[in-house]
Regions:
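Short Gly/Thr/Asp-enriched flexible loops that form oxyanion-binding sites at enzyme active sites
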Residues: 32-54
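Short, small-residue-enriched loops and turns at beta-alpha junctions
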Residues: 4-7, 66-67, 188-189
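ATP/NTP phosphate-donor binding region
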Residues: 1-22
Length: 189
């Protein structure tokens, strides 16, 4: 695919998942380069679509293009390559010398090389002067056989609760064609 990541749709996630599942048969690790605007969404989707993936699948990208003299792309690719070579199965996001679980990475900054954070879970690895420092105890064990689950429901609405939100939004959602509503509520305190 050669697509601006802001244009990616669930159909592309399905295509990426299918191609990755096929490639798992012949490779020991896979690196997927991706634009940063939606990379976290793709990493999360792949985490749930590639159930029990037997090899490392690592997504990475860069804030500055590869041809830019100060690009972060080479460092991010090295980080992704180190994780892909680790042999540890799972879907991961590698960025700014950190490796996080694919379902935990979130883009939190639009500029700056530290654009991604692992939310409510520490990074599972870091690249340091000593190489890739893995925290294996943080990586969930693969307990199921590999299978591709590429059926997606796109009729889900994400609602972020905010102070002053008009409760009438719930009536509108009930009248819509959505099959599910995910409510991003306030924290626990």
């Amino acid at each position: 695919l050669s697509l601006d990541s802001s244009n990616i749709q669930p159909e592309e996630w399905q295509l990426i998942a299918r191609q990755t599942a096929e490639a798992c048969r012949d490779h020991d690790g896979i690196i997927i380069t991706h634009g940063t605007d939606t990379m976290a969404y793709t990493a999360s989707a792949l985490t749930y679509m590639l159930r029990g993936v037997p090899i490392p699948v690592v997504l990475t990208g860069s804030q500055l293009p590869l041809v830019h003299p100060l690009s972060d792309a080479p460092d991010n690719l090295r980080c992704a390559a180190a994780m892909a070579a680790s042999g540890i199965p799972g879907v991961f996001l590698a960025f700014d010398r950190k490796v996080m679980l694919g379902c935990r990475g979130v883009k939190v900054r639009t500029s700056g090389f530290d654009a991604f954070e692992s939310i409510n879970y520490p990074p599972v690895a870091r690249v340091t002067g000593a190489g890739l420092e893995l925290h294996r105890e943080l990586i969930p064990a693969q307990t199921e056989d590999f299978r591709l689950e590429d059926g997606l429901c796109t009729q889900v609405f994400l609602l972020k609760l905010t102070p002053g939100l008009d409760p009438g939004i719930f009536d509108l959602l009930l009248q819509s064609n959505y099959r599910g509503v995910l409510i991003e509520a306030f924290g626990a305190g």
